[in-house]
């Protein structure tokens, strides 16, 4: 059992018989009332985000989730095909299930696929990925004086803000949790 005092971002709980992930939470103490935990939770099957208030100390079941390492093979229409690294079985996952994680996945990349009751739910790419800049504006002399940023479109279609010195063709390290540029990778 998981208590509200153990809540943290990314924790998965079972609420009303369905798997949810905690996106954000805040412990709130109110005058002359019992404290509550104001929580944003994301339904792992549908991706819908709910805002719920739980009494402090309420307990939740831990969902029966299974994590498998799979390799991304290719896209086929509105689905993406992955291969189980142990059984070599191939599964097709609809684009809606993958969500924004698709911006961090390249061919042959190993990802974690979270299963709930035998059904693939969530794709979790590695925490950091290296992606190449497909297009960005050229840097001009004097741009770096202000230390600003510019948009850059990466090979997967993701657009991130990068420093002015980044050019088309550069390899960048990206944080998949925030979608932010971390550093330029030396090749």
From Swiss-Prot:
Keyword tags: Cytoplasm, Elongation factor, Protein biosynthesis
Biological processes annotated in GO: peptide biosynthetic process
Record's subcellular location: Cytoplasm
Top-level taxon: Bacteria
UniProt xrefs under InterPro entries: Elong-fact-P_C (IPR015365), NA-bd_OB-fold (IPR012340), Rib_uL2_dom2 (IPR014722), Transl_elong_fac_P/YeiP (IPR020599), Transl_elong_KOW-like (IPR013185), Transl_elong_P/YeiP_cen (IPR001059), Transl_elong_P/YeiP_CS (IPR013852), Transl_elongation_fac_P (IPR011768)
This protein's record includes keyword Cytoplasm: yes
CC per GO annotation: cytoplasm
Pfam family, any one: EFP_N
Keyword Chaperone: no
UniProt pathway annotation: Protein biosynthesis; polypeptide chain elongation
Residues annotated as signal peptide: none
Any GO MF annotation of the entry: translation elongation factor activity
HAMAP family: EF_P
Family matches, as PANTHER family: ELONGATION FACTOR P (PTHR30053), ELONGATION FACTOR P (EF-P) FAMILY PROTEIN (PTHR30053:SF12)
Role noted for this protein: Involved in peptide bond synthesis. Stimulates efficient translation and peptide-bond synthesis on native or reconstituted 70S ribosomes in vitro. Probably functions indirectly by altering the affinity of the ribosome for aminoacyl-tRNA, thus increasing their reactivity as acceptors for peptidyl transferase.
Record family assignment: Belongs to the elongation factor P family.
Protein name, UniProt field: Elongation factor P
């Amino acid at each position: 059992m998981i208590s509200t005092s153990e809540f943290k971002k990314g924790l998965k709980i079972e609420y009303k018989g369905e798997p949810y992930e905690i996106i954000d939470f805040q412990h709130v103490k109110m005058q002359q009332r019992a404290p509550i935990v104001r929580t944003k939770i994301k339904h792992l099957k549908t991706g819908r985000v709910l805002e719920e208030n739980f009494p402090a100390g309420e307990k939740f079941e831990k969902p029966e989730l299974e994590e498998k390492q799979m390799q991304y093979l290719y896209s086929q229409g509105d689905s993406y095909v992955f291969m189980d690294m142990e059984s070599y079985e191939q599964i097709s996952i609809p684009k809606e299930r993958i969500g924004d994680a698709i911006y961090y996945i390249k061919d042959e990349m190993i990802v974690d696929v979270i299963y709930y009751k035998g059904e693939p739910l969530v794709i979790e790419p590695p925490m950091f990925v290296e992606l190449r800049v497909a297009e960005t504006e050229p840097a001009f002399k004097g741009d770096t004086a202000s230390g600003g940023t510019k948009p850059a479109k990466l090979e997967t279609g993701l657009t991130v803000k990068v420093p002015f010195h980044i050019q088309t063709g550069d390899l960048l390290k990206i944080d998949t949790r925030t979608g932010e540029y971390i550093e330029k990778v030396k090749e």
